[in-house]
């Protein structure tokens, strides 16, 4: 293959990394992009490094090929200009590692679903032995060059079709003005793109370190990074928790579906051990922090991520609920709060958090591995006794209409919902105030919030 054809074929692959998301693309690109990167490094980059005079002639071949390919795939002028800037040969040379350049294309491909991007990130990590030691700074540096995201901020939504190019599917609603273009729903724009990418790469790095360790103890450097994230970047911290929790649930499901495949089950169990150890370290970090820090973490972090982790990890929910109701109890019952008026912003945050938790009505199975925290005993004793008070005791929580033949071990397999547990906790605090004089402003506001939440949710069974 001569040089011109080789460059043209490589450009086609790069364009697909930047703009593709169809199924055949996914399989094709992931399998060969890193192989082509190595070939390009040897065939082109190494020669340019030895002889800088080759930059201009190769750059001309590159630009001519890029223009030709762009016209062949029917991209419009705006999209072509973006490609000429982001997939230019001279821009590629700015990267120390060509694979990091390819990663930047994946990160900037707004058409990728979360699942596809995670696969791309895993693939990048597994095929790049020279990953920079300071992963966070490197990925932030790459992501900061996300001109596609900058374009989206500058253009009105109705011009998105111009940005992406006319080659992608659209759906024009006949009842709307024909000038309004509604993008094909596979286009996935995630504002957490950078944080998710950082979390995935950090997690892969952590797990690679753990796999090479003889003992199960978490590596001290990993603990240090996790602690820094908890204090300085809660979004990345939550993304790591979400990915870990998802992987554990996914492995458990795979184990259930592969009862006869001992090798797969053993691999999943080994992975789960590492996942659980890291989750345990992260939850311990939250639990041991001061109440003010915990409250700020749960009230001010990304709500989508908080709810996503809560749905997947019951132990995280326990910490979440404990922090919220510890704050509530302080303003309701603590003598030191008599003269203190709760900040209106915190009251709004608190109300919004409880409202979000009360929306989580899907059944959950409380059978997660032991973690470093547990709910208040009075909440354990009252979980899910709705319409089922007869003959139930503390060891039969949440077994609605199914009290026969249960024993103490059923506690590990209780079925309930986040909404029910939160509503139960609200009712307990309201009941506990019956004997108190709560005429202080702060107590009145907090109590009114709880009563309003109870009344607005009492009709939803």
From Swiss-Prot:
Composition bias type Low complexity, residue spans: 381-413
Record region (Disordered): 254-273, 368-414
Name this polypeptide is given: Putative uncharacterized protein DDB_G0288973
Source organism (scientific name): Dictyostelium discoideum
Biological classification of the source: Eukaryota, Amoebozoa, Evosea, Eumycetozoa, Dictyostelia
